[in-house]
């Protein structure tokens, strides 16, 4: 078991809650392992950029775009907009568990949306080896 997994699991619980450390769950590659689930979200996003030969670190000028996001995408964008407040609250209340909980919730929302792309072509990130500009901006956020 790696130190990153141990830290993530320990940080994902409030200090006033008893820590239930399940070694089997932490080794799983599933939604039951919060660290894996968050890392898998990042891996999926990175794979989209690799497939279209873009660097995830490149800046995007959003002034030239008009966006038409679905309800599901807007919900994810709202969750992303909570990040600064999550950091601030976590710091001011000395509750670091808020950060891994937030990341897990965001990853869960993203994975749900990603899986919708199997049934709805409009929700796919890459279609015919192309990606729309609004999807690029969405993923960069």
Regions found by a protein language model. Give the residues of each.
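Non-catalytic interaction-recognition regions
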Residues: 1-141
